[in-house]
Amino acid sequence: MNSQNSQIQPQARYILPSFIEHSSFGVKESNPYNKLFEERIIFLGVQVDDASANDIMAQLLVLESLDPDRDITMYINSPGGGFTSLMAIYDTMQYVRADIQTVCLGQAASAAAVLLAAGTPGKRMALPNARVLIHQPSLSGVIQGQFSDLEIQAAEIERMRTLMETTLARHTGKDAGVIRKDTDRDKILTAEEAKDYGIIDTVLEYRKLSAQTA
């Protein structure tokens, strides 16, 4: 496996299976994440941090360069993470020309919930048992220093919170004041509740059920 491929794959807790594909170009060994990337699918299955943000931004930019008119799909199962990493991914999602479908499976919590809501309107989805959690941003670790330093940190937390609220308000249609009140504490939403809230547009049916009723 070359280094370029390894950079776009989240860390797995077990060895991913590889498989062989035959085509007119010959035989190629692949793995699930490479195959998803070929299908223009990005999988966010880890915490949102600088490493995962860099990987996702790189994939978004490459997929746009390959075909700016084809949709990119981002599957999300993430506990959230850092605010600056979130905004780096968010800005890149808004920057690229391709529409971005977002799909939550498992959970989209904290920063990941903002990314879920930031998909192209009408193309934001969740599976039936997914959950979404929104809350105000915070700084990790113990904050120490002079009073003036603490004031700077407090101002930064307030700036981050206001930016998150206005971002969610933009994508959900909710008033920023409502967002602030709802995110004072953890607000946990089912898939249907996330739809009513404006974070997603559609709760997906299982493909098996859709095929049976067709």
From Swiss-Prot:
Question: What InterPro entries does the annotation carry?
Answer: ClpP, ClpP/crotonase-like_dom_sf, ClpP/TepA, ClpP_His_AS, ClpP_Ser_AS
Catalytic activity, per the record?
Hydrolysis of proteins to small peptides in the presence of ATP and magnesium. alpha-casein is the usual test substrate. In the absence of ATP, only oligopeptides shorter than five residues are hydrolyzed (such as succinyl-Leu-Tyr-|-NHMec, and Leu-Tyr-Leu-|-Tyr-Trp, in which cleavage of the -Tyr-|-Leu- and -Tyr-|-Trp bonds also occurs)
Q: Which GO terms describe its molecular function?
A: ATP-dependent peptidase activity; ATPase binding; serine-type endopeptidase activity
The subcellular location is: Cytoplasm
Biological process, per Gene Ontology: protein quality control for misfolded or incompletely synthesized proteins
How would you summarize the oligomeric state and partners of this protein?
Answer: Fourteen ClpP subunits assemble into 2 heptameric rings which stack back to back to give a disk-like structure with a central cavity, resembling the structure of eukaryotic proteasomes. Forms a complex with ClpP1 and ClpX.
Provide the function of this protein.
Cleaves peptides in various proteins in a process that requires ATP hydrolysis. Has a chymotrypsin-like activity. Plays a major role in the degradation of misfolded proteins. Degrades anti-sigma-D factor RsdA when present in a complex with ClpP1 and ClpX. Degrades anti-sigma-E factor RseA in the presence of ClpC1. Does not seem to act on anti-sigma-L factor RslA.
Protein family according to the UniProt entry: Belongs to the peptidase S14 family.
Checking NCBIfam families in the record gives: PRK00277.1 (NF001368), PRK12553.1 (NF009205)
Name listed for the protein in its UniProt record: ATP-dependent Clp protease proteolytic subunit 2
Quote the gene name from the UniProt entry.
Answer: clpP2
